[in-house]
């Protein structure tokens, strides 16, 4: 009986020691990425206004235009794979305003940047805002939804989330 107990303890200690020395990566539970969205609406500079094509408009001025800058940051992306982000279609939203026949979305650009443990998605566009107030602009920006999806590298689990695009909208003085 004593030999069986000693043998069992010896076998148990061997298993514990071998488990501790294992080189296999331990799977950990990584949380979803942290998401932040910021939107800034500001007047154009003189230089920016000089680059805007205004021939189709009657008596346009620099004050009739605004630049919108949207930044989405995903932090904690080192453990994620197949990250996909779909930002709102602001061109469609601004050009199809109810009771407004004006083309509002003038032009825009965007960039996606992967850094260490974070991804940054930037969109910038120029709006023709004559006869629009800040609240109307904010309402249209706020209706947009940002859709994200990703997989966890260690578990292959797929996740997706939707965020309000208009959470942090700041207007800079005209």
Regions from the PLM with identified roles:
Residues 16-20:
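C-terminal motif of bacterial Sec signal peptides marking the signal peptidase cleavage site
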Residues 11-14:
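Helix-turn-helix-like N-terminal two-helix hairpins of bacterial/phage DNA-binding regulators
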Residues 3-4, 55-57, 130-132:
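Short secondary-structure boundary micro-motifs
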Residues 29-38, 131-174:
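Surface-exposed edge beta-strand/loop patches
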Residues 23-124, 162-172:
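N-terminal export/targeting and maturation segments
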Residues 100-156:
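Short, solvent-exposed, Trp/other aromatic-anchored flexible loops in extracytoplasmic proteins
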Residues 1-9:
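Bacterial N-terminal signal peptides that target proteins for export
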């Amino acid at each position: 009986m004593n030999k069986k107990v000693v043998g069992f303890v010896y076998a148990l200690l061997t298993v514990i020691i071998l488990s501790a020395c294992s080189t296999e990566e331990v799977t950990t539970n990584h949380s979803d990425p942290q998401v932040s969205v910021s939107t800034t609406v500001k007047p154009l500079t003189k230089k920016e206004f000089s680059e805007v094509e205004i021939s189709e408009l009657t008596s346009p001025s620099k004050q009739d235009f605004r630049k919108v800058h949207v930044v989405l940051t995903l932090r904690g992306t080192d453990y994620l794979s197949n990250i996909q982000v779909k930002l709102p279609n602001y061109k469609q939203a601004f050009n199809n305003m109810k009771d407004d026949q004006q083309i509002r979305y003038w032009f825009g650009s965007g960039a996606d940047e992967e850094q260490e443990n974070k991804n940054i998605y930037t969109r910038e566009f120029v709006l023709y805002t004559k006869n629009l107030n800040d609240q109307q602009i904010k309402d249209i920006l706020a209706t947009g939804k940002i859709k994200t999806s990703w997989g966890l590298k260690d578990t292959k689990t797929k996740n997706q989330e939707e965020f309000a695009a208009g959470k942090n909208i700041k207007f800079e003085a005209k």
